[in-house]
Amino acid sequence: KIPSNVSTITMEAPAGDVDINDIKLDEFNCHNKSGDVSISRVEMKRADFTMLAGDLDVSDSNFDEISMKLSAGDVDLTNTTGNLYANIAAGDIDIQKHAANVIQLSAAAGDIDMEVSSPIIEVKTTAGDIDLDIHGEIQNIKVTSTAGDIDMATDSKDYQASLSTNFGDVDFDDDLPYQKLHGKKYIVGNGKGEILIKTNAGDISFQ
């Protein structure tokens, strides 16, 4: 149990797993060189994870802001909230039922699978597939990949989407109430939100 007068924890773990449950903090900093980190049922204003080799698993937790930098490891977030900033060198990212105002993800090598509610999203990957399921209002969404397929679905009915691939196919769901502009540009509703999806080598599917 954390004493009530402790609001900030900084943890240095050269080797070994970290398991944290049922705490409330203003700030949590975790620097782990080797080992997995598991976080569950916590409330934090800010959490920062820097990991060299290991997986990060966060569930049923609320943050104002969560940031992470992993050299090699997978990221799993389930039923969480908070503005999210992630930089992953090698590893898969799986985010389910996450709500935020801003999400920024970058992965050099790995797949990204997300079901989120956030009006502002930026996702970049060098090599890997991207699968996005976005709920709620859209303000600005930018998804780019050097090599990989991109699948996106949204329940929003007010956006304009620009889809581009140099080597691949583009499939825009014909059941959506859209107007098509020149090229692979589409407007749904009044076109309030902006969506840009671009891959150099890969297919794009939008529904």
PLM segments and residue spans:
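Right-handed parallel beta-helix
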Residues: 2-69
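Short, surface-exposed interaction patches in beta-rich subdomains
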Residues: 2, 40-41, 56-67, 74-88, ...
